[in-house]
UniProtKB/Swiss-Prot annotation:
Cellular compartments annotated: Membrane
Residues annotated as transmembrane: 10-30, 56-76, 95-115, 129-149, 188-208, 236-256, 267-287
Membrane topology: Multi-pass membrane protein
Glycosylation sites noted in the Swiss-Prot or TrEMBL record: 167, 175
UniProt-listed Gene3D superfamilies: Rhodopsin 7-helix transmembrane proteins (1.20.1070.10)
Topological domains annotated Extracellular: 1-9, 77-94, 150-187, 257-266
UniProtKB keywords: G-protein coupled receptor, Glycoprotein, Membrane, Receptor, Sensory transduction, Taste, Transducer, Transmembrane, Transmembrane helix
Taxonomic source organism: Pan troglodytes (Chimpanzee)
Primary gene name: TAS2R7
Protein name: Taste receptor type 2 member 7
One Gene Ontology CC term in the entry: plasma membrane
């Protein structure tokens, strides 16, 4: 029964992976083509491209981990070859979260309107420093990933190996103090970008409220370009926060799975849920970006035209 559930979850993971690769590759391809054409790249496009690349890598690592867990359980339990995968999963996980946080920060500074001197100073300089912020996210993610992978996953692999030999939950002996400190370190490292996104969300809400109030007082209506920009940014930030919560819970299931009777099943279940975040959020970003949305509509229109042309040719040959 457990094998059937694992196989079903694996097929689900493959489907989520395919959808995620399609959306994120589209974002990266459109922005890179625009970069080559204009010989420069806008800050928002740089953030979206970095986010798309990190999520493509994250999707590949998670799916590879799923395949090895189901098809090669002995390799999964050894802890030697898997250390590389563990490192890249932790790295791409934090890169994806921090790049999404950079996107939220960018929305807050570019769209929100406040007259505090510090906010205005940062608003005017955000385009100049965004590449350095992204580079800092890479350095920070590497700094977090190296010790976390070494400590946390060593205990996890040992536990999986012990359970496969004895089939008893209590046979797993890990250093709980070290494990708890590593989990606390990972949780705090993940909680920081979440809090930053939450602050960006509240800034956008407050800015939108003040803007609508000004528009109502001037009797010019509420549906102006600034309001639309606020709403699009809020949709992107809210979707990230909700999907991030689901992803974080699935991450907790996967990393805490050796306290459960069916470790392998808990891991692949957590990974299947985790794939939803990098897969679905890319399409929300496409719909919220004018250039990406128009490019996607062009692609859909061309595909429909090709399909209609093929149907016409088939009917012509039959007739």
């Amino acid at each position: 029964m457990a094998d059937k559930v694992q196989t079903t979850l694996l097929f689900l993971a493959v489907g989520e992976f395919s959808v995620g690769i399609l959306g994120n590759a589209f974002i990266g391809l459109v922005n890179c083509m625009d970069w080559v054409k204009k010989r420069k790249i806008a800050s928002i496009d740089l953030i979206l491209t970095s986010l798309a690349i990190s999520r493509i890598c994250l999707l590949c690592v998670i799916l590879l981990d799923c395949f090895i867990l189901v098809l090669y359980p002995d390799v999964y339990a050894t802890g030697k070859e898997m250390r590389i995968i563990d490192f890249f999963w932790t790295l791409t996980n934090h890169l994806s979260i921090w790049f999404a946080t950079c996107l939220s920060i960018y929305y807050x500074f570019r769209i929100a309107n406040f007259f505090h001197p510090l906010f205005l100073w940062m608003k005017w300089r955000i385009d100049r420093v965004i590449s350095w912020i992204l580079l800092g996210c890479v350095v920070l993610s590497v700094f977090i990933s190296l010790p976390a992978t070494e400590n946390l996953n060593a205990d996890f692999r040992f536990c999986v190996k012990a359970k496969r030999k004895t089939n008893l939950t209590w046979s797993c002996r890990v250093n709980k103090t070290q494990h708890a400190s590593t989990k606390l370190f990972l949780n705090l490292a993940t909680l920081l970008p979440f809090c930053v996104c939450l602050m960006s969300f509240f800034l956008l809400i407050l800015s939108l409220r003040r803007h609508i109030r000004r528009m109502q007082l001037s009797a010019t209506g509420c549906r102006d370009p600034s309001t639309e920009a606020h709403v699009r940014a809020l949709k992107a930030v809210i979707s990230f926060l909700l999907l991030f919560i689901a992803y974080y819970l699935s991450f907790l299931v996967a990393t805490s799975s050796y306290f459960m009777p069916e470790t392998e099943l808990a891991v692949i279940f957590g990974e299947s849920i985790a794939l939803i975040y990098p897969s679905s959020h890319s399409f929300i970003l496409i719909l919220g970006n004018n250039k990406l949305r128009h490019a996607s509509l062009k692609v859909i229109w061309k595909v429909m035209s090709i399909l209609k042309g093929r149907k016409f040719q088939q009917h012509k040959q039959i007739g």
